[in-house]
């Protein structure tokens, strides 16, 4: 290990930055974030750097660097393109025992800057010892996706209660177990879900009750998106990996299901047209029952749970029984599949609005507001419209839409098995029969479909017509 990782307190202390360009600005911002007083020395100083120093009450010295600029400083940064000057700054700082960093010159540094993931007060630093800073930044980018932005609030909550917990649990091992359970339990989840006040109230109750464990379950209603696992949100992935039991439907791709916690119980509750593996009211009751047992329940739905996903019915049942829940939106099929097919749902020249329509209503009919659906300047996206497609096309034409209106079928959109077929309202049902198109398939109707010829970018199964 060439460098010992340490965290340096600069609060209220003087830090010297030699240089006035963009690199100096980046370093100065870090120093300012750490509470340092800035002294910037350079013949010319970047306007943003000038504002940063002035706002923080620092010193601007618009002249050449002088050796007398160093005394009294807690840290020195050399950020110029003048190598002899950088070397001079480094030598003088080392002679005085002042930590010094020379940008892009590890051999001249007594300290180096790591790549930083800032969730203050939680901070993660990644360093390559100056050998491969780009690699360190790439690792930091991965960490940024893995560490929720609310971890800082969680650390702050722990800080506020640290002394009280120490009084209640004087034994070090007991405290360690307490904090491990807290950071992996319901209180932490409230913070991560954006409910810090509720988390603090629960912790107060927990401490007032003598630290007795209260097992309270919760339901995570999570949108799995249209199929491509890369389209999952960070929060969706985090909840998928901590749930005790998973209830999933048939639109959840196997590759997405594999991202759930390995030892979680999995319950298939999928539905097909006129065929319910588990009736919806039973699903609602099951969510309540499992959460009442203290389990963390993941209700994983394809697309977005609030767009033709019956998510509203499920959380209505949870709310009626006082079961905590959170909802994580997903990319709905219309947005995801259209994007992967190269079909913009709105376009200044073709469509000024888009309408999402269910092709399968509660009573099994396609009794839709046809007159509204044939209005000009809009794109129609039909979910679950494959079985009723002949009626849909017939009614749109009967109510005034041209039979030559462009239309598209997108089967298993966003996945490697994606197939896209384009035609018109007149021949779309025929395309379904010719190419043996099956569910899940999205139907798009509108002038925007014709843009696919030049905007298609995703290959999929390459069986397009």
From Swiss-Prot:
Region Uroporphyrinogen-III C-methyltransferase, annotated ranges: 217-465
Keyword check for Transferase: yes
CDD domains the UniProt entry points to: SUMT
Single biological process term from Gene Ontology: methylation
UniProtKB keywords: Cobalamin biosynthesis, Lyase, Methyltransferase, Multifunctional enzyme, NAD, Oxidoreductase, Phosphoprotein, Porphyrin biosynthesis, S-adenosyl-L-methionine, Transferase
Catalytic activity, EC: 2.1.1.107, 1.3.1.76, 4.99.1.4
PANTHER family given in the database record: SIROHEME SYNTHASE (PTHR45790:SF1), SIROHEME SYNTHASE-RELATED (PTHR45790)
Family note: In the N-terminal section; belongs to the precorrin-2 dehydrogenase / sirohydrochlorin ferrochelatase family. In the C-terminal section; belongs to the precorrin methyltransferase family.
Protein name (database record): Siroheme synthase
Source organism of this protein record: Pseudomonas aeruginosa (strain ATCC 15692 / DSM 22644 / CIP 104116 / JCM 14847 / LMG 12228 / 1C / PRS 101 / PAO1)
């Amino acid at each position: 290990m060439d460098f010992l990782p340490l965290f340096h307190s600069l609060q209220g202390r003087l830090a010297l930055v030699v240089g006035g360009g963009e690199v100096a600005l980046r370093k100065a911002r870090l120093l300012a974030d750490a509470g340092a007083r800035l002294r910037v020395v350079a013949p010319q100083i970047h306007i943003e750097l000038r504002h940063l120093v002035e706002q923080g009450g620092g010193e601007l010295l618009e002249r050449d660097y002088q050796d007398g600029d160093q005394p009294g400083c807690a840290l020195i940064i050399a950020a110029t393109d003048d190598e002899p000057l950088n070397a001079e700054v480094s030598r003088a700082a080392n002679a005085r025992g002042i930590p010094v960093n020379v940008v892009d010159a590890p051999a001249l540094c007594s300290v180096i800057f790591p790549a930083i993931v800032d969730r203050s007060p939680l901070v993660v630093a990644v360093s390559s010892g100056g050998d491969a800073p780009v690699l360190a930044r790439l690792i930091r980018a991965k960490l940024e996706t893995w560490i929720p932005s609310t971890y800082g609030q969680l650390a702050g909550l722990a800080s506020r209660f640290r002394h009280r917990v120490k009084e209640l649990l004087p034994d070090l091992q007991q405290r360690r177990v307490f904090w491990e359970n807290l950071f992996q339990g319901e209180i932490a989840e409230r913070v991560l879900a954006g409910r810090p006040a509720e988390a603090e109230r629960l912790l107060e109750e927990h401490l007032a009750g003598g630290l007795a464990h209260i097992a309270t379950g919760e339901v995570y209603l999570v949108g799995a998106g249209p199929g491509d696992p890369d389209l999952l949100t960070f929060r969706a992935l985090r909840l998928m990996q901590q749930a005790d039991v998973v209830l999933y439907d048939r639109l959840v791709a196997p590759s997405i299901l594999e991202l759930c916690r390995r030892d979680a119980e999995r319950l298939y509750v999928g539905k097909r047209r006129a065929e319910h593996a588990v009736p919806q009211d039973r699903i609602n009751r099951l969510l309540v029952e499992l959460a009442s047992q203290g389990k963390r329940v993941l209700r994983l739905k394809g697309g977005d749970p609030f767009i033709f996903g019956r998510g509203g019915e499920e959380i209505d049942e949870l709310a009626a029984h006082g079961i905590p829940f959170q909802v994580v939106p997903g990319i709905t099929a219309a947005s995801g599949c259209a994007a992967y097919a190269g079909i913009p749902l709105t376009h200044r020249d073709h469509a000024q609005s888009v309408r999402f329509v269910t092709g399968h209503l509660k009573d099994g009919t396609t009794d839709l507001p046809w007159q509204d659906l044939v209005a000009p300047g809009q794109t129609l996206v039909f979910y679950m419209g494959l079985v009723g497609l002949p009626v849909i096309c017939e009614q749109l034409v009967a109510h005034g839409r041209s039979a030559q209106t462009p239309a598209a079928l997108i089967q298993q959109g966003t996945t490697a098995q994606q197939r896209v077929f384009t035609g018109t309202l007149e021949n779309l049902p025929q395309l379904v029969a010719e190419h043996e198109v099956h569910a899940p398939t999205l139907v798009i109707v509108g002038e925007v479909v014709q843009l696919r010829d030049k905007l298609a970018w995703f290959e999929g199964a390459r069986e397009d017509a």
